[in-house]
């Protein structure tokens, strides 16, 4: 019975959309004077529209790009303060919403593997784009985004840096560390 309830809770979090809620205040680029925002859409392997934006202040560091990976339950706007700090440090920052989140397409988030597939699609699109082909690309991710950030090097070994904030690299290991007794796999 307990395991069934846990499975239901997991499925309700993973197999649904994660859209804005009035319970959470989301900052926008307009809340930071001088922060520039430019739309850049990526088509996922599954055909979903991944809506993202480049954020920067005038004259960012040449050929340096940080891709920001958001956590579960929010889109990238839940991290606008962190994105702004990176932009203020002189970086061009690309932040997007995963499949099934906020401004991106998809009926459901699709779980942990979907975030990794989305990041692969984004990095592939950036690496193929004429303007960003010669950029040093780094990835910063939090929680769910930290999972994809830690695992993306297996697919894109040429990334300059990866930084995971409260991330985990193995779903099985994460579950075994945080659940005990009957709940332990």
Residue ranges and their predicted role:
Residues 1-43, 51-53:
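An N-terminal hydrophobic leader/cap segment in hydrolases
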Residues 141-151:
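Glycine-rich nucleophile elbow surrounding the catalytic serine of serine-hydrolase chemistry
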Residues 62-71:
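Short beta-strand element of the alpha/beta-hydrolase
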């Amino acid at each position: 019975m307990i395991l069934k309830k846990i499975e239901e809770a997991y499925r309700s979090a993973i197999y649904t959309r994660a859209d804005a809620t009035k319970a959470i205040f989301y900052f926008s680029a307009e809340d930071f004077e001088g922060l520039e925002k430019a739309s850049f859409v990526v088509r996922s392997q599954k055909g979903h529209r991944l809506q993202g934006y480049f954020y920067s202040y005038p004259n960012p560091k040449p050929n340096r790009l940080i891709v920001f990976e958001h956590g579960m339950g929010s889109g990238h706007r839940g991290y606008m303060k962190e994105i702004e700090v990176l932009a203020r440090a002189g970086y061009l920052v690309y932040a997007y919403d995963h499949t099934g989140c906020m401004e991106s397409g998809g009926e459901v988030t699709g779980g942990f593997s979907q975030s990794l597939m989305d990041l692969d699609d984004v990095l592939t699109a950036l690496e193929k784009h004429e303007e960003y082909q010669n950029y040093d690309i780094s990835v910063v991710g939090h929680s769910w985004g930290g999972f994809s950030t830690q695992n993306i090097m297996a697919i894109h070994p040429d990334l300059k840096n990866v930084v995971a904030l409260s991330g985990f690299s193995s779903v099985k290991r994460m579950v075994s560390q945080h659940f005990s007794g009957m709940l332990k796999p």
